[in-house]
Each structure stands twice: as C-alpha cells, then as structure tokens.
Amino acid sequence: MASITTTTNFFESIPRPTKTYRSASYDRISTRHGFNGTGKTVLITGGSSGIGLSIAKAFAGAGVARIAILSRSRATQLTAKAEIEAAYPSTSILLFEASVTDADRFASVLEELAGVHVLVLCAAAVHARVPLAELSGKDVQHVFDTNSVSTVNLARLYTATPGKDKTILHVSSAVAQMYAPLRSVYGASKAAAVQAMQHLAREHQGTGDRVRVFSFHPGAITTPASGAIYTPGAVQWDDADLPAHFSLWLAGPESDFLNGRYVWANWDVDELVALKERLACDGRFLTIGLVL
C-alpha cells in the first residue's frame, strides 16, 4: 500500500468559506453548542471506536438518556460501554452487534429503541491505496455497500419511523469533494452518500416534519484506517474532540440553516452562522454537485 509522506497541512490549504480553521475543539461547540440531551436517544453506527466513540462520549457528556452503539465487534463495544458508563453513569449504553449493511437488522434495532432523536452515521469502509485497476470487484462492492448503500438504507428506515423530529449526522470525508490519489472508489462512495443526504433533506422541506440532515468532514483524525495510509508524522492531525463537539452543535437548533448541506468540522461555527443569509438565497452553496 502506498503511503503519504508530505508534511504540508494539506487540508488547511483547501479553499473554505470561513477564515478560521479549527484543529481542536473550542468553547463555542464544547459548552455552548445549544444541544439539550435530556431524555434523548442517540444511535451511532461505528460508535465503538475512533470518531464514532468520540461522538458517543460527547453526547453522553451532554446528558442524553440513551446511546445505542451499532457495530460489528462485540469486544470493542464492551470496552466502549465500560469507558462511557464510567465517565457518564447517568447515560444508558445499549449495544447492537451488526453490520450496517444488514438493513433488516437495523430496522429491528429501530423498532426496539422505539424512538431515536439523533442518528449518527459513522461506520465506513476503506480500500487499499492502489489504482482502480488493482482493486477487486469484491473490494468495490464492499466499499459502496458500506459507505453508500447502507447510508441510504439506514436513513430511509430511520426517516420512516414514527415521530416528526429527527436529525441525521452523516460523517463523510473531504474526498467526497475532491480528487484524492488512489482513493477512487472510497471518494466516489462518499460523494454518492452526500448526494443522497442532500436529496433527502430537500424531500422533507415543507412537509411539516422536522427532519434535518447534515453531512460533514470530521477533520484529519488518526484512526487504525488512517494509520494504514499515512506515515508517522506525515499529517497534522486534528483532535478527535473536534468532530465530537461539532456533532453536538449540529444536533442543536442553531444549525438549522445548514440542513441538507456539506460542511467541515474544521470550519468555525460563528463564521458559518455569518453565512446564513447567503445559504438562504443560494440552495447550491455548500453542497456537492456541478460547479459552473
């Protein structure tokens, strides 16, 4: 597998709508996010490790009643449950061992929970960093099934459940918006999922339902998957609390103006709020699509 050895802060160099680029959490999203967790249930796919676990801890810290973690590894789930409950004993941690590609199992989880206020879609699959011709058909199918098809299916099933107040936080990737060498299928799968989330948000506008859908790049967070691609010291890593606390802000009421948009956790939220008028006037701003 080829590795990236550049020491340039590549992600910060990408054009963005805010002047300020955040690499760590800050008070505006850690304590003044506006999300009220009282009595709420949060379901997180891939929530037993990495970014998903950081997000789970953030919601527990915000006082939600229940956090349901859906992932494939029971051992990892049990470790995550112990960590969260030790720090936040008032939050109940529920574990569901399943693949996100199993739509029937996900439907039964939703039925068992009987009400989910926030769905965090964090599970993802990557492929070897090789040219497209060197990937197998099985590789391609697995990445699209996990990153695209399951995202659509889980969002479809969730929005069909009773209740009019639902929030979807889709953890995406910067490769959804740009070319990344030797990441062809991964990038395409992420872009497809963002497009689907944009359509979903539009479908619910004016229906009377409060269905909010946000896709976001979590930042450059070190995970086992990223460790297989980047050499030590090659990337200026962001703090995992950044996407975790950004998720709290997105789940709160102040982010309504970003419904259906694609953003980065690195973008300063006050500077995003300052763009509210432009977003109201330009339905294509901060979306994935054709640029003319």
UniProtKB/Swiss-Prot annotation:
The active site is at S172 (proton donor), Y186 (proton donor), K190 (lowers pka of active site tyr). Pathway: Secondary metabolite biosynthesis. This is Short chain dehydrogenase/reductase CPUR_05418. It comes from Claviceps purpurea (strain 20.1) (Ergot fungus). Short chain dehydrogenase/reductase; part of the ergochrome gene cluster responsible for the typical purple-black color of the ergot sclerotia. The ergochrome gene cluster produces several ergot pigments including the yellow ergochrome secalonic acid and its derivatives, as well as the red anthraquinones endocrocin and clavorubin. The pathway begins with the synthesis of atrochrysone thioester by the polyketide synthase (PKS) CPUR_05437. The atrochrysone carboxyl ACP thioesterase CPUR_05436 then breaks the thioester bond and releases the atrochrysone carboxylic acid from CPUR_05437. Belongs to the short-chain dehydrogenases/reductases (SDR) family. InterPro entries: NAD(P)-bd_dom_sf, SDR_fam. SMART domains: PKS_KR. NADP(+) binds at I44, R156, Y186, K190, I221, T223. One of its GO terms (molecular function) is oxidoreductase activity. Keywords: NADP, Oxidoreductase. Its EC number is 1.1.1.-. It is an enzyme of class 1 (oxidoreductase). It comes from the Eukaryota. The lineage of its organism: Eukaryota, Fungi, Dikarya, Ascomycota, Pezizomycotina.
